[in-house]
Amino acid sequence: MKILSVGAGMIGAIVAQELSRENEVTVFDANKAALDKLAAKGGSIKTEHGSVYDAEKFNAIIEANDVVVIAMPGSLAIVAADSALNLKKPVFDISSIPNEYLMNKIQPLANEKETLYVPKIGI
């Protein structure tokens, strides 16, 4: 399975490493140093440097994957979840999107797109 892990921070890097044991994983992050640190550990993880606000690039990377895992701060996670759900990709969200936004915007979008959205994993 092709998995896009959005976020290369402490949690995102661990999640990506675990998922890469049995899947093809690409990690996307705006922090080049975090991506370089992850790549230096070796393994089969691919890295992509960029911003979730660069819709053209981010959407192309989402499209190339089967599932999206979000491991980034809530404000950025909102953008990532919105993009992935609009492209009808299942989302597993480790972030902390505020409950009000989650219930009023993200979950209704997932329902509308008939796409799986699993929020607040591990929180």
What are these regions (language model features)?
Residues 3-7:
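Conserved N-terminal Rossmann-fold NAD(P)-binding element of oxidoreductases
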Residues 27-30:
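Conserved acidic E/D residue at the C-terminus of a beta-strand in Rossmann-like folds
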Residues 12-13:
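N-terminal Rossmann-fold NAD(P) dinucleotide-binding loop
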Residues 51-64:
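Conserved Rossmann-fold cofactor-binding substructure of NAD(P)-dependent oxidoreductases
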Residues 95-117:
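Rossmann-fold NAD(P)-binding glycine/threonine-rich loop
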Residues 42-54:
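Rossmann-fold cofactor-recognition segment
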Residues 32-34, 98:
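Helix N-cap at the beta1-alpha1 junction of Rossmann-like dinucleotide-binding domains, i.e.
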Residues 52, 66-81, 94-100:
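N-terminal glycine-rich "phosphate-gripper" loop used for MgATP/nucleotide binding
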